Each structure stands twice: as C-alpha cells, then as structure tokens.
C-alpha cells in the first residue's frame, strides 16, 4: 500500500510542478487522474481485505473511502474516457468525436 501511495503522491507533485511552470499538457492530467484513482481504489480494496469482515463495517472508514473513490472515478471523468485520451496520445488516432 505504501508503494502505491508514494507513487501517486509523486505523480501528483510532478503534475503540480509542470502546471506551475506552464508546461503541463492536459493529456498528462488524464494519466494522473486515471492512475491515482485506480491506485486509491486498489489500496482501499487491500485495506478491506486486511481487515477481513471488519472492513465492511462502519467501525472502520474503508468502505466510506471506497464509496467516495467510486464517485470520484465518475465525476473526474470515467476511466474509459481517460483511456481513450491516452490511446490517442500513443497512436495518434482520434477516438473521440
């Protein structure tokens, strides 16, 4: 979990540095959003597994965080949209009209 957390933090930090320098490509934002939300969901799932049955109770905040992340995945732009944007970057073919 710590590895994924630190990778996500470094990616967010680097995107912030690029933005401050005026060098941020909007497609890089798709990389950050897609990666960091996916990793956060994976961390929540791992935490839920570690806690066993307690992971689904209100005694621990794991399910609340997982539910919040599911909504973030939706309002930040679905992972499919970010995947299409990144596919265009890699192939040069427009996937969105």
Regions found by a protein language model. Give the residues of each.
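Alpha-helical interface subdomain recognition
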Residues: 1-97
């Amino acid at each position: 979990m710590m590895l994924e957390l630190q990778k996500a933090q470094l990616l967010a930090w680097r995107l912030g540095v690029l933005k401050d320098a005026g060098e941020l490509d909007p497609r890089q934002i798709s990389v950050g959003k897609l990666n960091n939300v996916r990793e956060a969901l994976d961390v929540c799932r791992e935490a839920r597994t570690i806690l066993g049955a307690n992971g689904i109770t209100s005694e621990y905040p794991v399910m609340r965080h997982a539910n919040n992340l599911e909504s973030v995945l939706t309002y930040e732009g679905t992972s499919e949209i970010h995947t299409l944007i990144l596919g265009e970057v890699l192939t040069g073919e427009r996937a969105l009209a």
